[in-house]
Each structure stands twice: as C-alpha cells, then as structure tokens.
Amino acid sequence: DFLDNYGAELNFEAFEDGISICLKSLSEYFDRLFPLLTLLIEEPNLFEKEFTYCQKEALNNVIKAKENSFNITFNNIKKILYKEHPYSFNCNGDEESINLIKYDDILKEYQSFRKRKKYLLTNNSKCKFSKLKDIEACVFDKKEGEIQPNLIIKNKNNYIEHYSNSKQIIIFIGSQTCPHNSKDSISLKILESYLSYGMSSLLFKVFREKNGLTYDSGVFYPVRKFNAPFLIYLSVSEKNASFTFSLLLSIWNDLLSKELTNNELSLAKLKLKRSRLHNYRSLEEITFRKVRLLGLGMDPFYDVHVENHINKIKSEDILNISKKYLTYPCISLSGRKQICKDLKEIWRNKY
C-alpha cells in the first residue's frame, strides 16, 4: 500500500547466480522510498505468518511445474549436465527442500545475505549510498579476470528420459559451455542467433517452414557466472518424432563440421545486434543489465564494446568454438515409453 500511494514498483528476482531487487518511482518521491531497500537488505522483515504463506505458495508453484513435461525435460538435462553443481537444481526448489525450511532458517539467511557482495545502481544522483551498509557504490573499476570453464570432456551418462502419456515428444540436446565473461560467449551468441532468432533462423526453416514438424523450437543459452548450458529444444508429435530427431542430430553434426556461409554469418550478426538493442531499451532493462554484469565481476560498460567483438568474429572461429564445447552433447526426452526407446536407439548409434 505504501508503494502504491506513490505509484512506485518493487520487483524481486532470484536466479542461479544472484538476487535482484528493483525499485522504480518518480524522482520526487525517491528519497521517501529509498529506505525500503535498507529494510529489505539489512533487517529481517518477514513475519512467521507470512513465511508460512510464502512456503505454501512456493510448494504450489513447484507442484504445478511438475505437471509440465517441458519443465521436467528441461530439469532432467540440467541434472546430467551439471550433476551436483548448483546449476543442476531448480531455482524454485523442490517439495522436500521447501518443506525442510523453518522460520529460523530464514532469519539465519538474512545474516548470510548481509555478508554477500552487493551492487547498487541508480539514475538518481541525490541518492545517499551511505544509508546502505556493505554496498559497493563505486565499482566501475572492479573487474574479475576471465573465468576459465572447467568442462566435463565427455559425460558417460549422456541420456535421460521421462515417460508420459502425452502424444507430444519433447527433446532437449546440449552441452556445458563457458561463463558469460569468456570471449567464447560472443561466438556462441552468434550461433544462437543463427539457429533460433526469427523466421530466418535455421530451426524455423528446417522444422517449420520446410517440413511442418514441430510445435515449438528454440535455443536456451542464458547468462551465467560459470559454465552456461547451450541447449536446443523441440516439441513434436509422436508420428514425426523419429524423423525430427534425426534432423536435429544432423543439424548438431553440421555445427561441428561446417562453417557458416558469409550470408549466414552476416545475418546472424545483424540479428544479434538488433536483439541486444531491443532487449536493453528501457532504463530498468539497462540498469538491471549493468547490475547483472557487476555481479558477474564484469565491466558494466561491457556492452558498449561488444559490437566491435561481434564484427571481428569469423565463421572459422564459430566452428572452432562449436567443436570446443558441443562435441559431447547430452539428451533429455519426454514422451510415451516406446517412442523414447526408439529415439534412444537412434541416439546410441550416434553417441
């Protein structure tokens, strides 16, 4: 109610590598609202009654997610890609872990949170950073060295399946790659653009335009502090599953053996640049991106220089990066048992 009276918004997001809190308001009201961040960061403010409600809500969200075969297939491939690494777990948790959390654990978490590195960005020059303890306000010169990926060269357990009664087959194929602050990540972003950006993308042309096979297709390549996953996903009907799967493996093989043509490379670069402009248009998006970069130990003005790096990358570079990270993929399937067994046979013959 306090925020609504000033027409302000407070947004919170938790992800694999951190937590983001965003406060938006008119400049004239910011001084009155800014102390809320102090309360959120420094003082336990969740009453036990509210904790119980939040715990039930978290459980409901997890239970709903378990009903979605796409989520199950996605979570399964993370389990075999990362094993006991934090990236193998769902940010929303699971039923067992949520039920084990007690109110005292939340109070202890506040103490842990106060010790973590925090970064604050605002466009309000009158903001007094000293109100917040342990906030690094002037961090633009703080950069970590490039994190080298600690890759699993070949995962012996590269296949996982989930049986469902659905007539839809869901497929995820992918590998661990590099952290976001690696120079290799730009080549992988170009590859993502080539595969999945728009109606000119390879996945759309092969699976939808030419063959009319898939309900959905795309690439998942997120920003991560450590090894990010590079995943291609598809959903397809049972009758088209084998043909679609063979096409997918053929595309994956081409990524490891063929260079992009000059036209393909130019178009992929152009789409990537335009995507970046589209994603970082609003003040909120730009600020969140800079805070995210700081949290990853990167230059908050990294994006200013990215276009020059994109322009320098050649098809040969992308092929070499593909060979470096995508040679030993893992696969996750969801569908009826017999269809999964048929696809598993195709997979075992290839990998």
Segments the model singles out, each with a brief description of its role:
Residues D1-E146, I171, T177-P179, E209-Y351:
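Charge-rich, well-structured scaffold segments of protease-associated domains
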Residues G145-F204, H309:
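His/Glu-based metal-binding/catalytic segments typifying zinc-dependent metallopeptidases
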